[in-house]
Structures are given as C-alpha cells and as structure tokens.
Amino acid sequence: MKTKLLNITILSIFCSSLAAEVLMKPTSYSSELYKEKILDGNYVTSIDHPNTFLDFNYGDRVANHTQISNAILRWAKQSNKLKVIEYAKSHEGRPLYVAFISSSENINNLDEIKNNITKLSDPRTTSNAEAKSIIENIPAVAWMAYSIHGNETSGADAALGIIYHLISSNDLEITMMLEDMVVVIDPMMNPDGRDRFAKSLEQYRGTAPNYDDQSLIHTGDWPYGRTNHYYFDLNRDWFYLTQPETQGRVKLINQWRPQILVDGHEMGAQDTFMTGPPREPINKNIDYDLIKWGNIFAQDQAEAFDKKNWRFYTGEWHEDLYPGYSFYVQFRGSLGILYEQSRMAE
C-alpha cells in the first residue's frame, strides 16, 4: 500500500512538472491571428535578434521591463544608429529609457539638431532667413510613445520590434528615412504597471489559449496594470506633472519639440482600430494648422487601413479638449496622433 501511494505521489509530481513546463510555453495567439511575418526585412547579423533577450519567440508573449531594457541597452552598444537615454525612474526604481534612432551622422549630431530646433521655436532670436535654412537642413523629429497604460501591452512589444527593425534593416527605404528623420521611441511609459500586469499573466496563463475576453488572463485583477505604482493614471498627468515618470518625459519632450508624437494604446477586446481625427470638443487653444495636418495624416492612415482591409473608426469617444493627455504636446506646437487597437493581452 505504501509503495502504491509513493508511486502515485511521484507520478503526480511528474505530471505537475510537465504541466508547469507547458504553462511557461507561449500561447499561440500571434501565429493564429496574425499570419504575416512580424519582422520581415533584410537584417544585418551583427545586431542581436529580439529573441535573444526573450524566453519565447518575439510576439508570442508579453515582454517585461527587464527584457525590453536589456535589449535596447545591448543594441545601443551594437549600432551606431541608436542612442539610448534614461530620462526618469519609476516609483519602484525601474529606469525609463528613450531610444533615438537615425543615421549614424544624425546620431553624432543630436545636440546640434536639438539646438537648431530650439532656435526654430523662438522667432524672437531667429531671423526668417536662419529659420528657413534650419528647416531645409535638419531632419524631422517623430516621437513614438507606447504603453502609458501598463495593461495595454502590445505597444511596448511593438516598440521592441520597431527599434530592432530600424537599426538593423538594410532596406533602402529605411536607410533613406533615417537620413531625413530622427525617430524617438519611448517603448514603455509605465514600467511598474506593465510588470504588475505581466505578473498576472503568468499567474492566470493556462495550458491552452483562452479566447474568452472575460477571462482573468485578459482582464487582469485589481489593481490591474493600467496605472503606476500609486495607481495614478499617467495619461492624465501631462500638465499636472505629479509623477516622476511624467516629469522626466515631459521635460525631455519639451527640449526636443518633435513635429509629431504618436501615442499607442489599446481598447476593448470587442473593438477594432481607432485613430484620428478626434471628435468635438476641440480645445480652442490648439492651432488650426495642427487640426489641418491631423486630418491629412488621418486620411493617409485610412487609406493604409483600407489597403489592408482592416476595420477601423475615427473620432467617437476620442476628444481633444483635456490637456492632461499626451495631446499636451499640441499646446506646444507638436501634432499629436492617437492609435488604439483592440486588446487580448496574451
């Protein structure tokens, strides 16, 4: 009898170990829902693939703060097209990084580019002739900001792939773009919330994919990962500046005055995609030229979505009134664009 119980115990432990191993394997959402290859380009071999830093294939599961940080810091040593700056630390001590990506020449001249942008922003100290010369000779600055809500996970994961694609691709289109543009990527604006939600994914992950959007693996549990350590919504803090993440971020953005800032979010699982232009009310302090260019970008985005046959909508609940969103930048002359996509978490 004792021998039988011992055998049953050993067998149970063995089966539990197998189940634990399966639980750690990535879910198969990406391969089932997205048939196109995510990273598809002509890449140099001297820069490590994102899989090097992950316990799974890129895109199969949510990457945590440590994995993303390790990747971009390593890439900064491997590529002359990338410069990484730490601009803040979260309440829990996690560093927040921003990645400057451009041609090697532009990266070497970042300080000069920033100084020229500062001159361009102040007509009191810059003549028309000097302003025209600056406009013709400096690259544009495009700021990409992701996952300010920690449980809206795809933004930070997308940022990881975008950084790799831009610094390692030999494609002519990418090379030409980086000669004319400095792409600034803030991959993870809320590391504390993201890691809190990533931990809940580990806790609720099953042995098989779960497509029920009411499941805890997709919704998480309180206090969720949307907010930072003190449960503050960082996408309400852009002009109040009460949180260290926001203070460092806004200071850096104000120094660079990008022409455009894209804010990547997720929304309900039953949704599709949403982008600009926003609905009314529009804050009367936003310059008309920004509204005009927002509509131009919106039309271009709509055409791109139509080519892919992706369903999307504009406006609806997205307004441009409150200055505490990322659209704070529009009160300083930058065009703000919101991207929203439906979420499944993992």
Question: What is the role of each PLM region?
Answer:
Residues 1-2:
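N-terminal secretory signal peptides that target proteins for export/translocation
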